[in-house]
């Protein structure tokens, strides 16, 4: 019944198996990829005909994580997989980027590649298996997929590179790098790094590239036995068409590329295109040529002009040399109500960035195959149509926006303080207000500025730069700080972000084969010099975090209570904690180890909540002194309320050393007095003294002592890297707590 073909190889100590012919047999191509207990189904479907009027290659990649693959039922009301998660979008892009450049340039059949995780093993990198599976499916499909791609993941632990590290190992790794490529060259790199050098990053790319060569051989073996006949392809346009356009319109195109302004240049090129269409109107009517062929030929001529000018004259569209960076302008504090803000402008690319602080309650909850976890740092990249002068409606975040936001997140995340140093959740919003290349790297620069303006104690400023490449045979030029046309007509988009001492994020997409490691090394070094220049310009505006937080930022304090008292603070059904939150207007976060974090808009609200928590959590000891309120006066003494919810009795003899005939002559209901706990009667009721409390307080200047340890006197509107939570018993700094938390508002 099944004509199954299976190929396997030992890869990094595990069996990698790729098979076809058993599942999804009606698709043009389908493979299952297995490693450990992970199983992925990767399919490819290619439309038989090209849609009328289409002028691009409609390739769609969808990566799906099925909840059942990890033995889970999806959350939410409908209990089924819905729209793609950010993780699924990011992996879909990871698959797309090395594969898309390898199709025949004239191929325009609608193509869908779907990779579904059917069984999930956290010890295997399913994103890497998805790239391998997609490449294998395409290799046996009718699509003109020109070269085979494979991928690997690289970690750096204890100074050693680790191939395909598990999620657990990645927690201690200095590097999380994905590299994909063909037998001859690297096609794509995506990474987050903890301030690694250019040389170390290049070593990691080489390590990953060499590691997946075994997988390419495996896919070739499968394709040799299982591949289907490929579509026969013709040239994108007749060479005679290009020659005729060159003869008639080359000078006009050259003049257009002398214009430095993006908008003016685009307008001129659009007019030239209309002239070309008018010239060939009869040929179009006679169906000798179509609009797309004419447009493609004109773009090829534009590319030749731009590329030759760079290679032969070392001059770019805007007049810069290959290493020049566009003019930079930085500004902070534009938005007075935001906790931090910055405007970063580089040439015709601009990013307006804001920083907002929140509490633990504001952390992003992420539901993944590994389980639910929380993200304390969030970065949202927004690319509105007006940034490129397009009249389009604003929509939900696109895949591109999700991908660019994650790249900027990777660049910033390694330099953020931990939760002990800075207890807030952080949201950065970067809106691209102008775009002409490298908007994601402008986001990185603007985010660094906004975080420092907000007072976040980051380890060092971060900047990003996008590098490009023009390569013809043995001649090549690496371009610093590319603009949009250089990205479009060039051969590489290579983004590098980092501090003055090392790289934090790297993303590389190559559009042609034959890029060797020498070129990558040159690009990395040129990017380092460009990054240092950008950091120098940024540092002129702000070079270190502000010592104080914005007046609009929430205040916070952390206290430590006995774990046995957590239930008393929460109360039945959360009654007590809700009452505290309502009366104080504060938010309270209680950890299982007894750490209580309190957040509010000002210190007065925090004090109200803190006093109420102390009142419940404190177990008074004999000899301690408290502030108390006279609740009731009797002939024999007075009842005193202290610590908010505790009562005691002061006998008339303990009120004063002087003789008192009538208690009401000395104390009245509502009076605030100092009291000292001197013992308990046989019913457990507290016995208090006023006279000794005042004696001890004045003689020893006794400070109230509670078994609640807090830093409530430490104002959070300052350099929060100096914030400490102390345990008075041993005077050691409390370590960061990573536990399940209980949240109340």
UniProtKB/Swiss-Prot annotation:
All residue ranges annotated as the S1 motif domain in the record: 623-691
Short name of one Pfam family: PNPase
Gene3D superfamilies according to UniProt: GHMP Kinase, N-terminal domain (3.30.230.70), K Homology domain, type 1 (3.30.1370.10), Nucleic acid-binding proteins (2.40.50.140)
Organism lineage: Bacteria, Pseudomonadati, Pseudomonadota, Alphaproteobacteria, Rickettsiales
Primary residence: cytoplasm
A cellular component annotation (GO) from this entry: cytosol
InterPro entries: ExoRNase_PH_dom1, ExoRNase_PH_dom2, ExoRNase_PH_dom2_sf, KH_dom, KH_dom_type_1, KH_dom_type_1_sf, NA-bd_OB-fold, PNPase
Protein name listed in UniProt: Polyribonucleotide nucleotidyltransferase
């Amino acid at each position: 019944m099944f004509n199954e073909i299976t190929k396997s190889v030992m890869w990094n100590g595990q069996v990698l198996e790729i098979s076809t012919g058993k599942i999804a047999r009606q698709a043009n191509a389908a493979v299952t990829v297995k490693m450990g207990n992970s199983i992925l189904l990767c399919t490819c479907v290619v439309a038989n005909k090209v849609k009328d009027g289409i002028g691009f290659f409609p390739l769609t990649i969808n990566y799906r994580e099925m909840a059942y693959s990890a033995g889970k039922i999806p959350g939410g009301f409908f209990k089924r997989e819905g729209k793609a998660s950010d993780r699924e979008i990011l992996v879909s892009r990871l698959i797309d980027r090395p594969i898309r450049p390898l199709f025949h340039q004239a191929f325009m059949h609608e193509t869908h590649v779907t990779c579904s995780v059917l069984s999930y093993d956290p010890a295997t990198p399913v994103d890497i298996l998805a790239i391998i599976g997609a490449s294998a499916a395409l290799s046996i499909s009718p699509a003109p997929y020109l070269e085979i791609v494979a991928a690997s993941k690289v970690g750096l632990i204890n100074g050693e590179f680790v191939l395909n590290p598990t999620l657990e190992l990645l927690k201690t790794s200095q590097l999380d790098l994905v590299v994909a490529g063909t037998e001859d060259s690297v096609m794509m790199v995506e990474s987050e790094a903890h301030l690694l050098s250019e040389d170390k990053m290049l070593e990691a790319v080489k390590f990953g590239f060499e590691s997946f060569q075994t997988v390419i051989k495996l896919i070739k073996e499968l394709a040799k036995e299982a591949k289907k006949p490929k579509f026969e392809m013709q040239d994108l346009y007749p060479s005679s068409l290009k020659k005729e356009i060159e003869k008639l319109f080359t000078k006009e195109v050259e003049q257009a590329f002398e214009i430095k302004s993006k908008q003016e240049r685009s307008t001129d090129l659009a007019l030239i295109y209309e002239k070309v269409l008018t010239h060939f109107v009869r040929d179009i009517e006679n169906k000798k040529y179509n609009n797309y062929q004419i447009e493609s030929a004109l773009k090829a001529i534009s590319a030749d002009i731009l590329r030759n000018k760079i290679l032969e004259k070392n001059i770019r569209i805007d007049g810069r040399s290959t290493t020049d960076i566009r003019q930079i302008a930085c500004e902070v504090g534009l938005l007075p109500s935001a906790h931090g803000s910055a405007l970063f402008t580089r040439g015709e690319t601009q990013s307006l960035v804001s920083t907002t602080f929140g509490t633990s309650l504001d952390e992003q909850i992420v539901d993944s195959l590994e389980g639910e976890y929380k993200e304390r740092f969030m970065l949202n990249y927004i690319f509105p149509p007006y940034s490129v002068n397009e009249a389009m409606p604003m929509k939900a975040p696109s895949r591109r926006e999700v991908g660019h936001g994650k790249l900027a997140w990777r660049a910033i995340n390694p330099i953020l303080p931990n939760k002990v140093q800075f207890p807030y959740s952080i949201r950065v919003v970067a809106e691209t207000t102008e775009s002409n290349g490298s908007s994601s790297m402008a986001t990185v620069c603007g985010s660094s500025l906004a975080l420092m303006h907000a007072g976040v104690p980051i380890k060092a400023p971060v900047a990003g730069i996008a590098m490009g490449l023009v390569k013809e045979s043995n001649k090549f030029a690496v371009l610093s700080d590319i603009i949009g046309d250089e990205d479009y007509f060039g051969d590489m988009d290579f983004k590098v972000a980092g501090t003055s001492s090392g790289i934090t994020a790297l993303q590389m997409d190559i559009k042609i084969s034959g890029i060797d490691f020498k070129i990558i090394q040159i690009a990395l070094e040129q990017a380092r010099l460009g990054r240092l220049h950008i950091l120098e310009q940024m540092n002129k505006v702000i070079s270190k975090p502000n010592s104080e937080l914005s007046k609009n930022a929430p205040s916070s304090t952390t206290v430590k209570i006995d774990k046995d008292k957590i239930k008393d603070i929460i109360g039945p059904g959360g009654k007590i904690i809700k009452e505290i939150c309502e009366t104080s207007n504060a938010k309270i976060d209680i950890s299982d180890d007894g750490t209580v974090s309190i957040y509010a808009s000002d210190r007065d609200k925090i004090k109200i909540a803190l006093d109420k928590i102390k009142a419940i959590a404190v177990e008074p000891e004999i000899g301690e002194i408290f502030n108390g309120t006279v609740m009731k006066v009797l002939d024999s003494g007075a009842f005193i309320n202290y610590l908010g919810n505790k009562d005691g009795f002061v006998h008339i003899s303990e009120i004063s050393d002087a003789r008192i005939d009538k208690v009401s002559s000395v104390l009245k209901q509502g009076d605030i007095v100092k009291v000292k706990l001197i013992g308990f009667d046989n019913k457990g009721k507290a016995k208090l003294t006023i006279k000794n409390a005042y004696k001890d307080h004045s003689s020893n200047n006794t400070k109230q002592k509670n078994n609640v340890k807090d830093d409530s006197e430490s104002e959070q509107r300052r350099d929060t890297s100096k914030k400490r939570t102390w345990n008075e018993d041993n005077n050691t700094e409390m370590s960061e707590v990573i536990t399940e938390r209980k949240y109340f508002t």
